[in-house]
């Protein structure tokens, strides 16, 4: 993966004031003077993307003024948008726009246009929009400089103050927040060739945006985006609805310049360094940190085309690992942060317990395809090391539009998504308690998972009526059993697994009662390393 990751973007946004700056009073914001513009719609954007795809790719990035290009991170983060300059849609619209300045790692300018009543007006760069802090320039910056990206603010957590709702900065990344949430993982418009061992991933990027903030009665903001890369172009529409669980309705039409086998739809990017299920980096490297866990997401949640639910805890592998999941006509998937207990993280500033889950629901049937989960080894929590995307089975052919849509929901609790019991903890340990007669031996390991929610708690007083249904792709299950766990109002399932040295096995476990599934299926891979 590129060194220019979402984690870099996250750090940059935080340093520029997003997520840590005080909320802005709506009374402080002003609207620019109306000016005439050309009519523009999503259909016009589709035509524009098609025309660009038919022409040779232009990857040229005009150089920044020397003084701006030389800014280090500390100097660049001194440049902050002036909140009182926030652009409002029509008079009284609850949505306001703030832009990010070019410089440091952000060298490719994007164009921004404001849509009002279907008319497009360019939103032009001006030094008056920014407070430059300690950053000084010998010469005035050019008036056609452009922007690195933008964010939209809305009274999300308080009726009189605005908070950041959604941001677009770097490549094709975007992020959205619901009420009481703090930025963690990111979404992308599209991925290309992610996970290739030759590190030949392509990063599509936004060239231009059109933003419609509506009027005083608007319940959403619409963002049109033109995507481009060496292999393809894309016309994207993001309808962003601020809520307790904010929603982004994504509509996309992609045009490829050549047949593309490696397109990833609705990709997500996150970080998992250490959790209760995977502490090997700490254990083997004597990692010295007060925080017990560090992750933006702790698992992959899937609802299959048949309606079955499964949960795959994330890991920080020793080497890059790619996992595939059959996902034909998939109903939903996402990277989730299930662990909401502060004392599991102990990080007052970063608040991992408030990081959102992003849940993806396709609009219509996507057909045959698979989910691709990529987990990269990381030595700390600053690197994004988890990528997830849905890949169609058939290559995307040039010469015709490839269209799809989906809903992205930013939520804190995923229990409402499924009535089944959920996995709330995953642990592993040597087989047999200290001093017991149980024998493990080489190539054996014990795995424990706590199930709670749904009807699981009903069986606390009669755990014997519940069956552990377990299978492995390699090796054998030596034993399995259930223990009531009142601490989670649920049941702990335990399996002891044995495999040959230096091999791996895929494990699946769910609970069954009266012949019916009681829980989602726990899915996990164990490598005997």
Describe each model-derived feature in a short phrase.
Residues 1-16:
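N-terminal secretory signal peptides and thylakoid transit peptides that target proteins
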Residues 186-243, 363, 367-375, 379, ...:
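Extended, loop-rich substrate-binding clefts of extracytoplasmic carbohydrate-active enzymes
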Residues 225-274:
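Acidic, contiguous internal or C-terminal segments within carbohydrate-active enzymes
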Residues 25-27:
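Boundary at the C-terminal end of the N-terminal hydrophobic targeting segment
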Residues 74, 167-169, 181, 261-403, ...:
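A contiguous, surface-exposed recognition patch within enzymatic or periplasmic domains that forms
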